[in-house]
Amino acid sequence: MGCTSKSEGVAFVQAVLTKTGSVDAKNVIVDTSNYARHFEKWLKVFSRDQFLIVKEEEISRTPFKVIREAEEFLDVPGFFREDMFVFENDKKRYCFKSTRREINSSCPLMYPPSVPKPEISEEVVHKLRDFYRPHNRRFEELTGMNFSWSNL
């Protein structure tokens, strides 16, 4: 029997919750998404102006603008052009296209067909949101930015 949304959800919940049902802050999946904790470590080594924080929704809406901003931030010559991005209606997002043979057009699937999106109960989602909320607010303070997902 292959992976199903339900089996993936069960495996995810077993990984991120303790036996008592609380969020396991030490679990690698949970810890990886604690952006504030990781960013605070980086800020001990680098100044805030050495970071470019990019919102996923901006990449989705205006990929060329975001890439141009990254090129300027890195002080590298502009390589990308607006015509290198095409909106794919079936995927509902922009994809990279190239006329060069060695670079294949790229628009990966969000979830590959072989990996079903996990089915997670509202109770677990609520626990995770409650756990991350203070960390997400701290990340907003550290970055000086607002994120759509920080107050869910």
Sequence positions of predicted segments:
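Anion-recognition interface
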Residues: M1-L152
